[in-house]
């Protein structure tokens, strides 16, 4: 685990974005942890979040021309990541996002920001079922652009309805790499460093045994 990944886990815990306990997911699964990126909701939170996304992007080595944030949650992520890349990595790259409803006046179409072209890095909070990615792919392809990769905050590394995860399905269906700031493996490594969290570690490991990929 790299220093920025440990810092991201601590940041998420401090904002209660990441919680340990017992939670029922939308799928009905009982999970020993919960991650709600919507609680990164202040100016300082967003500034820090962008730095973590930018760090993971640079660390990945994936080459891309433009950041795309799918509406709605991806919009502030794309914006703050673009700012962080410019301020901290001297990479001044364009960004773009879609609006859910097409506008019939003023700025045309359902895209805002730079023209959607070249190699696109899609940024979002998490991938649950991959629906937002599939919708975004239609937009990307319709504009003649290509998907360079996908960056999310957390990869839960668990099976979806099939034997592989929603993330693995996206990688298979779109022949792209999905990267994340942290994974379930990183969470476990973090918990292993914290004796006071042994109870949570046991629960997360048991969950991975049952649902992990």
Curated annotation (Swiss-Prot):
Which EC numbers characterise this protein's activity in its record? Answer: 2.4.2.10
Q: Please list the residues that bind 5-phospho-alpha-D-ribose 1-diphosphate.
A: 26, 72-73, 99-100, 103, 105, 124-132
**Obligatory cofactor(s):** Mg(2+)
Q: Name one GO molecular function term.
A: magnesium ion binding
> Which positions does UniProt annotate for orotate binding?
34-35, 128, 156
Q: Which SUPFAM superfamilies match?
A: PRTase-like
| Top-level EC class | transferase
Q: In which pathway does it act?
A: Pyrimidine metabolism; UMP biosynthesis via de novo pathway; UMP from orotate: step 1/2
Q: Which CDD domains does UniProt cross-reference here?
A: PRTases_typeI
User: Which reaction(s) are listed as its catalytic activity?
Assistant: orotidine 5'-phosphate + diphosphate = orotate + 5-phospho-alpha-D-ribose 1-diphosphate
Could you mention a single GO BP entry for this protein? Answer: 'de novo' UMP biosynthetic process
Q: Which UniProt keywords apply?
A: Glycosyltransferase, Magnesium, Pyrimidine biosynthesis, Transferase
Any one GO cellular component localisation term in the record: cytoplasm
Q: What does this protein do?
A: Catalyzes the transfer of a ribosyl phosphate group from 5-phosphoribose 1-diphosphate to orotate, leading to the formation of orotidine monophosphate (OMP).
Task: Please give the subunit comment from the record.
Answer: Homodimer.
Under HAMAP family, the record lists:
PyrE (MF_01208)
The family annotation for this protein states: Belongs to the purine/pyrimidine phosphoribosyltransferase family. PyrE subfamily.
Its name, as the record gives it, is Orotate phosphoribosyltransferase
* Gene that produces this protein: pyrE
């Amino acid at each position: 685990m790299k220093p920025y990944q440990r810092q991201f886990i601590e940041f998420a815990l401090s904002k209660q974005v990441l919680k340990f306990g017992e939670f029922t997911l939308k799928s009905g699964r009982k999970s020993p942890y919960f991650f709600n990126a919507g609680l990164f909701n202040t100016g300082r939170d967003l500034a820090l979040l962008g730095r973590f996304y930018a760090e993971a992007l640079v660390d990945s080595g994936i080459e891309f021309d433009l950041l795309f944030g799918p509406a709605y949650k991806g919009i502030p992520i794309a914006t703050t990541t673009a700012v962080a890349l410019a301020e901290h990595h001297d990479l001044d790259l364009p960004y773009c996002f879609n609006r859910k409803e097409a506008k019939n006046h003023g700025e045309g179409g359902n895209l805002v920001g730079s023209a959607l072209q070249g190699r696109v890095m899609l940024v979002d909070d998490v991938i649950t079922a991959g629906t937002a990615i599939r919708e975004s792919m239609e937009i990307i392809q319709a504009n003649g652009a290509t998907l360079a990769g996908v960056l999310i905050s957390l990869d839960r590394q668990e099976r979806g309805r099939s034997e592989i995860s929603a993330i693995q399905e996206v990688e298979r269906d779109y022949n792209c790499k999905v990267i994340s700031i942290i994974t379930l493996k990183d969470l476990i490594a973090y918990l292993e460093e914290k004796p006071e969290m042994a109870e949570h570690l046991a629960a997360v490991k048991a969950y991975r045994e049952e649902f992990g990929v």
